[in-house]
């Protein structure tokens, strides 16, 4: 047996039964594609002895089209997708079904974006394609996901009907469980060679040509559609036979419809997907209580066989609940319910049933909403009611339409040998550690191990909760652990926020990672936690994992330490056995990164065993603090009730009435979150400061702020809040203040690294230095609160805007959930400092939409006048077109308001009317609009003009997204929008990979970089988006890098915004996926520009009107070879260690390519210069 997750299990079968695989990343299906690509890169073979060809496409539409072409020419082909990706495939799925083309698409089912995007699991995507004509087979767990991947492949070849094999996103795709793997011989024996040969014989071939894809007319189209009926009528039998053949080969028997429960059941639940295992557990328990209940598992959903459904349903049943994991607003009911109801009604009408059971329908589990035993008990209880609800929801509290069922207490006995919860911080290694623990237990013991991981959409820095179960029996529990034998808190700050000890079983183990020793930690715990630990009679332990990790050179990665502590305390494996297994796992995971890293992790294991301390339980200390409120009392009511509950992990309990129905949320809620995740924060040493504001500009989270204020504003300042006389001539007589937001800083250290001011006696000391947050937080909180209330600078009064002055303007993008050290967010922050009070932002899906609009807290905020960026996200693929709609509307509204001005011209002073129709700065225009409103306030007929007069204030339209959007999936729209003459500004945050989905290659990925979907190094040069858009001639194009030239960045943004047409800014954005310490990113950015890797330029068509060449090249010719600089990044180093000979050639190719690109730019700029690297 093997321990594996659902995606891995499916990918293994799909890879071995395919010849061509077209891929594109989308959560939660991406890892299937990643593994297929990696296996192909390593030369692994399919069951026929060939290595499948794996190709990444620009979108899911491209992937399915490639599959279509491969199938039409005789290949066995597949792809993997989810959610919006599946929807992009719909037109081609219709074609595949209409052409009776055998093929399997593997889908990790996920929520489709509606009022909000959600990466989590339900059936809304697969239900949106049920009309395409594809057969649909649903797996309920990891074992089924693997097995059905093969059964669907057999059935599609037998039936010629394309199959969608789906399973629940995250709950199955990412659940780790112990399964029986399929051997190559078994797969090969089961694959129907006769049908494979027939598929190949139908291939398009000029040796025996045919025509497909014709355009039909009314005389024959209808008949042709009906001609496929026999093939669909035969699908059920093909699937059943494939399942029987599979059983004969493996011993695992499945049926398209399968009943589980009492043979004379009176109450039955019908559903499909991962919730089946939970229902089976409840059925088992209720059977022991003498109740006649059961569950009917739907596996083959399309074609839907009413005959076989009714054969599987006990004739004794008197009430049925059909559960759908989707919502179809406006429909009579959800899809599975309607199918079941139709089957029963037709059977009754045809005389095949004498009576009809009562059938009720419910929705559950949307967006991975928890569906546990209590939900199943509630449904069975409703089936017993005299008048059950015909339509209901379960798992939420609906106080608006009152559809929800009350949830009883979960009374199921627990048979697990061990249940454990691990609370970690995204990027601290907790999830990876738990995955290793599960695999160690599963692979080295006869026990079954299950792992599931709960996290939000933050890339890093968010809460992660890992669930681990160990049992002597196969684990069916597809729900979260509510009471655990072991709870590990990997971050001290969580003690104040989350109810963790409350989830401990009586006598359970509570392990806390803390800098405080066993002697001092008790008084540091909130009184509530002390009381719970006493109540549970917990065994309480502490370890200073962060200290051990630092001592072993592992930075913030505490996973190795916490893994060893878990095994040491639970003794689920004997101590020496656990140590040996962990050492082996470390060697396997890190050997490619060098033996030194392996040995440092081994050292951490040894120290961890020695460092765990037990803390005796003590009475509640009356001098200890209470758990602080989740948000400040000063927060708005909505934040205190709704946002606070979500921040505390209690959002599941919020009623329907508490939430906005249309997805509209308040701004600026990150200011109330106060994550406190930094171990160290920057402290200002003012006597060394040059007031350059580089630290403020570099800060990814707007957690360092600078202000220039009148001296009197500092008269009542806290003693620890320092200020300096302003050095700049244009601000003489004022005070300069620099201050950190101590609870919002992520501790990335970037500010310290970019600070140019050093102590002459000790260059290690700078004008800002990292110091312990715990030692400084209380004092700095007081300072920051005072700082925020200091007067703001008036942007319009600044003599010039450069990097120094721009950073005195309060940002309207703050404390986002981006990764620590993120290279994207400083650009967005700068935009809001320059134009935030009049910005409209269309944001493509990706990292920037997640840290920009991920609940429960959002970073875009408003100024003192209530103005700020108005932000919206549509989709990944359509952002350019979406933003164009903003521009067209703004222009149209302005035209209408100007028309209304003319209509009331006789009531407006001539001077004001002329001014309103002339150019003006936004500040002046707002004064004019205020004057207009005052002038027409008593004119009742002018209400429309007064209401909409703000349209006269010019809006700054920005279309923001990453390189995956701009270079790949959204390129067609971006290209079209730029081909127009509309005044839109496009900012591409170029990380050179799909950062949000885990670092897959895009067309922006450079030569030689190793990424997911490019495990053996990019073999071709990156697409030059900037140069290609220059070819239009009328587009402003700039390539910038904040770390390379701060002021060039500011200048390019200002020019782009002022340009009266389309503009494109491509901003180099360091990312964690690049594989180096992002604290050093600005230095790396400078070096990359020096090598020619990222030249800086501004292409301004207006320069041609002045008799100049449009292109201004702002960086010098390459002055050094790129190899040394690129090898600072793991994405380039990996190729050196994997394939040194290939890497050596690619470095030469890269140097030549960079030089050629620079020479082309220099020629365009009239600066034909020779490289300094020759």
Swiss-Prot record:
Tell me the function of this protein.
Oxidoreductase required for the transfer of electrons from pyruvate to flavodoxin.
Question: What is this protein's gene name?
Answer: ydbK
UniProt-listed InterPro entries = 4Fe4S_Fe-S-bd (IPR017896), 4Fe4S_Fe_S_CS (IPR017900), PFOR_II (IPR033412), Pyruvate:ferred/Flavod_OxRd (IPR050722), Pyrv-flavodox_OxR_EKR_sf (IPR037112), Pyrv-flavodox_OxRtase_EKR (IPR019456), Pyrv/ketoisovalerate_OxRed_cat (IPR019752), Pyrv_Fd/Flavodoxin_OxRdtase_N (IPR002880)
Q: Tell me where the signal peptide lies.
A: none
> What is the taxonomic lineage of the source species?
Bacteria, Pseudomonadati, Pseudomonadota, Gammaproteobacteria, Enterobacterales
Reported cofactor(s): [4Fe-4S] cluster
Q: Which GO terms describe its molecular function?
A: 4 iron, 4 sulfur cluster binding; iron ion binding; pyruvate-flavodoxin oxidoreductase activity
Q: Name one Pfam family in it.
A: POR_N
Instruction: List UniProt keywords, sorted A-Z.
Output: 4Fe-4S, Electron transport, Iron, Iron-sulfur, Metal-binding, Oxidoreductase, Repeat, Transport
Listed binding positions for [4Fe-4S] cluster 2 are 699, 745, 748, 751
Q: Which PROSITE patterns match?
A: 4FE4S_FER_1 (PS00198), 4FE4S_FER_2 (PS51379)
Question: Does Oxidoreductase count among this protein's keywords?
Answer: yes
Task: Name the enzyme's class.
Answer: oxidoreductase
Question: Which positions fall inside the 4Fe-4S ferredoxin-type domain?
Answer: 680-709, 736-765
State what protein this is by name: Probable pyruvate-flavodoxin oxidoreductase
Q: Which family does it belong to?
A: Belongs to the pyruvate:ferredoxin/flavodoxin oxidoreductase family.
Task: Write out the residues that bind [4Fe-4S] cluster 1.
Answer: 689, 692, 695, 755
> Catalyses which reaction?
oxidized [flavodoxin] + pyruvate + CoA + 2 H(+) = reduced [flavodoxin] + acetyl-CoA + CO2
Tell me which species this is from.
Answer: Escherichia coli (strain K12)
Q: Has keyword Protease?
A: no
Gene Ontology biological process terms in this record: electron transport chain; response to oxidative stress
